[in-house]
Structure formats: structure tokens, C-alpha cells
Amino acid sequence: MLLKADPTFYASPKLAMQAPKETLAYVAALNATGNGKPDAMVVVDVDPASKSFGQIVGHTDMPNAGDELHHFGWNACSSALCPYAAHPHVERRYLVVPGLRSSRIHIIDTKPDPRKPKIVKVIEPEDVAARTGYSRPHTIHCGPDGIYMSALGAPNGDGPGGIFALDHYTFEPLGRWEVERGPQYFGYDFAPGI
């Protein structure tokens, strides 16, 4: 059996730029009305040749109100090809979607039908806090040895914030990623590799 990397993983930025363009976009739809309805993930057709170009073609409600969906991203990317921690068999199919206000993390499967994404897992804030010591997940980045998430602060609403990791396959929180956070107190965004 030959293992083949996900075709959306590219060995260079040049190869990524030469790849076919995306035809769908996933967009967080926040409900800031206070009416008790949840946020949603909507699917927008971005294929200029499509009859439904620019229209919402899919919709998935979150299971709880008040999440405030934030900087979400894919579970896997080209970093899975990294020679020191290769995971060429992971597939870019899950959106990892943090709720900034609720501290929940939603795992949304975009297959088998990318227009009908389904929530397959919700990581509750108590689990994030117990395993990482953080809350308010903010930004996700896929990485060679896990999925990295920045967190704005601690479960008590104060600092310190930092970065924690999720497992590529189970999406379970693995714990804090950084060894030493330095002088920063509240976390925000981050850029792996810098």
C-alpha cells in the first residue's frame, strides 16, 4: 500500500500558487443580536464559473449560543510534509473553529460533501482549561507535530495566555506547547517558525 500525501499539501509556495483555485469558502457567521441563536459556519460559492457564484450554498449552526467564532483554520497543511515530523497521511478536511467568548473548540468535517459541513466534535472549555491551563482560544495554525492554538488568557479570565496543541487525529488537547513564554502575559496571535 502506497501512502500518498493529501493533494492540497504543497512542497513550496510556488506549487501552491500553481494549484487549482478554491471553489468554496467557509465563513464564520456571528450572531451578535443577543436573540439566543447560535453562530454558524456558512459555505460560499467562490467559483466565478458557477451559477451560484457569490451565494451561500451551505450552512451549519453551532450547537450552543454565544460562542463568537474566531480565527479558524484547517487541521492539516503542507507542514505535514515536514521531514522531522512527517504526517503525509493526514487529510485537510476538518475545520478547527474556536469560540472566543465560550472557549469551546468545534471540529467541523467538510467531507464527504463540502457544501454540507458537519460538526463531529466539540471540545468543551473545561477540557481545554484542565489540559492546557488556558482559555479563550484565538487563532489556529496547522503544524508538523500537531495543531497549534493561541489562547488569550487563563481560565479565570486573567493571564497568562499562551499556545497549546491539539492532536492531529483525535483533536484532543495535548497541553501547553511553549516551554518558556517569556515576558508576554496575555496571548494573542502568533506566527509559527518566526
Each predicted region: which residue ranges?
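Sequence/structural signature of beta-propeller modules
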Residues: 1-47
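Structural signature of eukaryotic scaffold interfaces centered on beta-propeller domains
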Residues: 2-21, 68-91, 133-144, 188-194
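Short loop/turn segments immediately following the C-termini of beta-strands
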Residues: 30-32, 98-100, 110, 152-154
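Short, solvent-exposed loop/turn segments at conserved positions within beta-propeller repeat blades
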Residues: 34-37, 90, 100-103, 155-160
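A short loop-to-beta-strand structural motif that recurs across blades of beta-propeller domains
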Residues: 40-42, 104-106, 162-164
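Blade-loop segments of beta-propeller domains
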Residues: 53-139
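Asp-box/WD-like beta-propeller blade repeats and closely related beta-sheet repeat scaffolds
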Residues: 109-194
